[in-house]
């Protein structure tokens, strides 16, 4: 793994094509024309987001009321395509960052930095570096983890596990953090920290999945910006992220007429609904289908596996800039499939044994009052959010599709719902969409515009943002379920 310095806005993991490596040896910063990074998203035309914002005055009110930065940042602009959800998001985020709670304000922002650093999300790191200083944080802490108090350092292990393999968290991890001593965490403090970590891991998925651009610097007036290479290769940036690479456009991103693709999806939804009404699968059959889907997720390639294509123009180079690495311990630790090939692995997390509604919600509310209500409202909002449309079709019940997206994320994290037929996942989620979901959820820093464009090509950008919101909240809930279950076991 190479390491190098970078600008303060540098993000980290990215694929390097051979030609660009030569350029990067000379300068980690590449001068590109400002129009290539104009607007809140590199994936969504600026006019689509701007139109939504000008029409909806509610967004401006929400920003004034709940934004910690006091301005309409790029995340908020993209989320404003779904104003109902945006309100739930901003209220919960404002509560965990600014309202009364167990942790001091600077700690909250430093924990956000630590969480974002696990996915090398410079956008969030920069945002919370500013907020950390504004709330009275000690500037020396920004030099890296070796400069922070030991009790913050002690969060590294649970931060790492939550971000990449939450199923490994046990009550022993909790006991280690709350044991008696000068650096111990109280349970309310730990719950607050866990909520922040899960929130910012998941938000990093949204940032990369939606192609959120760096905030514009008002001091730049010459039409050019020095930007650091993010999760795109340099030639992606120069060509608006349109990679001309056969290895990325083979069987994984099969070219299908997008109209017939949409009609086929609609037909599958209709057929599944009819089958569901005709007969109900047995519990044994449902369990078998979950295990099958869990194992099949092993073979869904994600962003990092593009490296393994033979004779690819991409090389297995990962650069973590010093600006990000200072906040990370064990940078090589990442996601591994819950069901690894040829191995007897960890037992499946049966959602019915520890649910958010019956267990997690009450524990969070008991130890960190009111955040449970805000999180619950946000989870319900995104899960039930619908406009009853699919691309150009109206009066469509999308419940089945939303549930498949949510449950597929949980499946990759080893969480099973006894009452869900996982055969529906294979019927409803095409391979290119599964690639996108796995990358955004498990390796968000590797998401590319090509992947975003490759699925549901007839759908509106607002519908794809809705997908990203579902993925973000499904991921956050999965992390919380594992962490809160471990805390519950510690208490019993």
From Swiss-Prot:
Residues 310-492 are annotated as: C-terminal domain. SUPFAM superfamilies: AhpD-like. The active site is at 121 (cysteine sulfenic acid (-soh) intermediate). GO terms for molecular function: L-leucine binding; oxidoreductase activity, acting on peroxide as acceptor. InterPro entries: AhpD-like (IPR029032), Sestrin (IPR006730). Residues 62-243 are annotated as: N-terminal domain. This is Sestrin-3. It comes from the Eukaryota. The gene is SESN3. Gene3D superfamilies: AhpD-like. GO terms for cellular component: cytoplasm; nucleus; TORC2 complex. The lineage of its organism: Eukaryota, Metazoa, Chordata, Craniata, Vertebrata. May function as an intracellular leucine sensor that negatively regulates the TORC1 signaling pathway. May also regulate the insulin-receptor signaling pathway through activation of TORC2. This metabolic regulator may also play a role in protection against oxidative and genotoxic stresses. May prevent the accumulation of reactive oxygen species (ROS) through the alkylhydroperoxide reductase activity born by the N-terminal domain of the protein. Interacts with the GATOR2 complex which is composed of MIOS, SEC13, SEH1L, WDR24 and WDR59; the interaction is not regulated by leucine. Interacts with RRAGA, RRAGB, RRAGC and RRAGD; may function as a guanine nucleotide dissociation inhibitor for RRAGs and regulate them. Interacts with the TORC2 complex; through RICTOR. One of its GO terms (biological process) is regulation of response to reactive oxygen species. PANTHER family: P53 REGULATED PA26 NUCLEAR PROTEIN SESTRIN (PTHR12474), SESTRIN-3 (PTHR12474:SF4). The N-terminal domain may have an alkylhydroperoxide reductase activity. Belongs to the sestrin family. L-leucine binds at residues 386-389, 398, 463. Widely expressed. It catalyses: a hydroperoxide + L-cysteinyl-[protein] = S-hydroxy-L-cysteinyl-[protein] + an alcohol.
